[in-house]
């Protein structure tokens, strides 16, 4: 398959943007990741995060895709988790692309926020966006409300060059409005004060952590730094049907619901992986 055929297949899958990188060891990312230090919920081995050959020895290309989701509204669940689980939806949509690659004799692997490599850094390298002070990747056309996936393949494709982006305008609104004060100048980030991290954290919360969550109004995730970002104003992006239907914007938990019942009821939602106890704890904070 040539690049044009691959890009067309990606577009037909419902992706809003696509970029391609040559598979290589991304040594320039090692320093960035070292400076960031240990971050929860992501691969800790920097080599695995920067070397695609550890997953596919004969990899030739990395195809990076953006899938838009609905902008934030008035909710208690972060908008990314309101619709059907994006891991499942995007993987299923991209299987049409990997099937075509297979038919042409190529191997491929799909990753959507479930692989060791950094989707955001890969997307940045192939020109799909720039970083805001909130740490989100921002695309000039569709803002930052999108999921990122990538396909690793042994099909050799022409690489895309990083685009000349205008970059973050530096208004500091995300820093100003962050309920926990997790953001700071020079793109600083403290996950222990981030509402999204705290609502996913297991175990007992400290009084300060509890107050941060209650201040935000969210029981899962947080969209405030995206909601106030000027780069998300006036954007128009096509959104696939799976991310527009059966939305859950709030959640009440029956006292008697078992872990098994919870898992069955919400198995198609991105928030279900943390289990009942974390969500119930968060909900109870607003009933005190």
Specify the residue positions occupied by each region the protein language model found.
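Auxiliary alpha/beta "docking" domains used to position bulky ligands
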Residues: 1-167
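Short, charged low-complexity linear segments at domain edges
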Residues: 139-162, 191-210, 259-263
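Immediate flanking context of iron-sulfur cluster ligation sites
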Residues: 160-169, 210-222
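Iron-sulfur cluster-binding cysteine motifs and their immediate structural context
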Residues: 173-199, 214-243
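Short Fe-S-cluster ligation motifs
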Residues: 198, 202-220, 251-274
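Extended alpha-helical surfaces
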Residues: 233, 239-253, 268
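Long, compositionally biased charged/polar accessory segments in the mid-to-C-terminal portions
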Residues: 264, 272-288
